[in-house]
């Protein structure tokens, strides 16, 4: 009925999937106001027995075009967590102007809205990708709080290789290793897989020759550090792994270098010092909790 309110608990894919674009169009064409709050299953489920990432969708069916699409960040269950306090203090922000195809950003604060607006004004990463050239290899699955981006393969079944013009490859690999890139991934993805669309929709700022050189050197420093901190784990006959050993990255140990990357690139996107600090500290309670694993 007109002006009826409905609420659903749904998988978080509602915010982050090509296949849900049709549902988005249906809602945006018929509901004047929509609210979506999102909740992670890691490090612990926010809702007991809800062992998947979830969203709560609330909308008012008005048979008119959407005027406000309100979203929240993806909430996690941390120390001193209180569910009632969370529910009473959900922070929504209008993200109607920041929707991508099948993707509704999971943000809560005006500072995030400002940052995302600036990032989206830059050139799409997909416009730099070539059929051949210098490789950048990224993990499209795994890596809960940090993503693994290298210029070489680790023979993982969950890695994908893309190619760039030689002068851009390492600088782009550096940018993709940043806190800013992780934040963009978190807000637009299902937090399980780094899909082609989300990867290609990340934005790259204008870079002069000096900046390209700085990013190149910083990326080489970063790669050296993550390899130094990596562990080689041996498996046994009872293991579910089908290899005798595998490399386990501890990317969090390189956080100080990652922060240096953001100090360099965030001003290129037009971010202020306050906005850069927000990005560097985004979800830091969980990212540096020791639970991280990038095998």
Predicted regions and their residues:
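Signature of N6-adenine DNA methyltransferases within the class I
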Residues: 1-133, 149, 153, 157, ...
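Generic beta-strand/beta-sheet core signal
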Residues: 9, 39, 59-60, 139-141, ...
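Short, glycine-/Ser/Thr-/acidic-enriched flexible segments
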Residues: 13, 64, 142-145, 152, ...
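Short, ligand-facing micro-motifs at secondary-structure edges
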Residues: 38, 142-153, 179-192
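Short, well-ordered beta-strand micro-motif
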Residues: 56-60, 163, 203
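Non-catalytic DNA-recognition/assembly elements of restriction-modification systems
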Residues: 90-123, 206-295
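Basic, amphipathic alpha-helical recognition segments used for DNA target recognition
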Residues: 160-201, 208-228
């Amino acid at each position: 009925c007109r002006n009826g309110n409905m609420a659903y608990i749904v998988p978080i894919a509602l915010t982050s999937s090509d296949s849900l674009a049709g549902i988005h169009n249906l809602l945006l064409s018929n509901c004047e106001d929509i609210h979506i709050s999102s909740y992670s299953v890691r490090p612990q489920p926010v809702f007991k027995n809800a062992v998947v990432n979830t969203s709560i969708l609330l909308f008012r069916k008005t048979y008119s075009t959407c005027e406000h699409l309100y979203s929240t960040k993806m909430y996690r269950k941390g120390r001193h967590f209180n569910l009632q306090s969370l529910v009473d203090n959900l922070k929504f922000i209008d993200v109607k102007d920041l929707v991508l195809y099948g993707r509704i950003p999971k943000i809560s604060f005006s500072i995030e809205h400002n940052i995302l607006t600036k990032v989206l004004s830059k050139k799409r990463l997909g416009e730099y990708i070539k059929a051949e050239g210098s490789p950048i290899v990224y993990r499209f699955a795994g890596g809960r709080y940090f993503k693994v981006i290298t210029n070489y393969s680790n023979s993982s079944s969950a890695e994908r290789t893309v190619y760039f013009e030689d002068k851009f490859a390492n600088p782009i690999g550096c940018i993709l290793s940043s806190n800013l890139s992780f934040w963009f991934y978190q807000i637009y993805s299902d937090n399980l897989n780094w899909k082609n669309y989300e990867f290609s929709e990340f934005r790259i700022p204008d870079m002069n020759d000096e900046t390209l050189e700085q990013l190149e050197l910083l990326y080489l420093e970063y790669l050296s550090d993550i390899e130094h901190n990596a562990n080689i784990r041996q498996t046994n006959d009872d293991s579910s792994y089908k290899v005798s050993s595998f490399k386990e990255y501890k990317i969090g140990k390189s956080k100080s270098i990652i922060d240096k990357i953001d100090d360099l690139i965030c001003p290129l996107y037009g971010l202020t010092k306050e906005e850069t600090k927000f990005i560097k500290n985004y979800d830091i309670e969980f990212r540096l909790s020791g639970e991280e694993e990038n095998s």
